Amino acid sequence: MNLSTMEQYWVWLSSVEGIGPKRFYRLISEYGDARCVWDNADDDKMKEFLPAATRKKLRDARNEQYFYTLFARLEKCNMRAITRLSDDYPELLSRIYDPPATLYVLGACPLDNARSFAIVGSRRCTRDGQRAAREFAEVLAREDVAVISGMANGVDTAAHEGALIGYGRTIALLGCGADVI
């Protein structure tokens, strides 16, 4: 994984429990960059931005062992991190309100240059819902449209199955790291 030093600090900061996109970008705005957040984790001013429990988690994560373990786990899982600072961060994703600071990728991430369509739905969908998602995804895949969904049972699974039946590309997009599945 070839991340710049600044990207490594972005991955570190975005990995701290309790720091989602809103808090992440507020800290970056206040401190300038993720390395400065690391350097100022004990700053009293943090009280303005983070609740006590999150401040403690930030301080606990500010050590070389946590930092090393974070990247060792990614490497062990053959995953890579893509930050908003990375050249390969998806352009369209960067335009949404509060985009994820870091994406964790296993395999290819062809989101920028591929036509794609997201199919999402209930974990407890009906058989008709599963069938519709599977058939729709199969048709899209045959038209060279990448199918994007989560990894939950139900509609997500049916969408991926349909894309595979159609010999297409399927991309699982998670709201968490792949190690949390």
Regions found by a protein language model. Give the residues of each.
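Glycine-biased, small-residue-rich flexible motifs in mid-sequence functional cores and linkers
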Residues: M1-M6, R84-I181
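Short, small/acidic-rich helices and loops at N termini and domain boundaries
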Residues: M1-S86
